[in-house]
């Protein structure tokens, strides 16, 4: 969002925010206005955020859900906020579920140490949509800048992948599990590239698992350019060392 629009949003009266956002939401359409939602998250007051989270309107609910991430940072002792985002991570609307992951990323942008235990808790949730939000939130390159968060991302990928292997075949076909599998189809590559040594070891262990969904996850990640480059670099380095040993 450019500066002009930022200033414009800040100047909108609270009682006019809903129609303002809805008119510029990009919905219905293939892509909602994420930049506008980010700006709302950065400036909205608590009451407006909590009001929007409860609305039926998809975009306003999206905006409110994402903005709770800032409230979690500002009010770390209020456990009800992370619980609310957790409920939205299992929302019927896919955009709202995505907003829950974005809310956690807002937390991570400010406080990685606050993000990590939330992800660790969510990835053990019985609802696959919540597990998906946890993995998608932490497997974001801009957040994987310190050893503890990189390790947390790999651990989240491992636990979420393992959770699929314990399910019967009929349950694996549900939309939530399919959504989780799809996320793991790219999140592993992000986590591995962020921490190549530990990541490649974990990914090799994953490749050894004899499970159809795990094989799909592995194959999907191997198609990602970021991981293919990492593998090429690793193989080149290994070949060089072998030649030197000769």
What are these model-derived regions, one by one?
Residues 1-74, 216-246:
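N-terminal alpha-helical scaffold/docking segments in eukaryotic complex subunits
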Residues 29-33, 61, 97, 131, ...:
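Residue-level detector of extended alpha-helical repeat arrays and alpha-solenoid scaffolds
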Residues 40, 44, 68-73, 104-111, ...:
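Alpha-solenoid repeat junctions
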Residues 65-111:
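Hydrophobic alpha-helical segments and helix pairs
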Residues 29, 56-57, 92-93, 126-127, ...:
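Short inter-helical turns and helix N-cap capping residues of alpha-solenoid HEAT/ARM repeat scaffolds
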Residues 162-181:
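Acidic, Ser/Thr- and Gly/Pro-rich intrinsically disordered linkers and low-complexity segments
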Residues 11-22, 41-53, 74-87, 109-122, ...:
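Amphipathic alpha-helical scaffolding segments comprising HEAT/armadillo-like alpha-solenoid repeats
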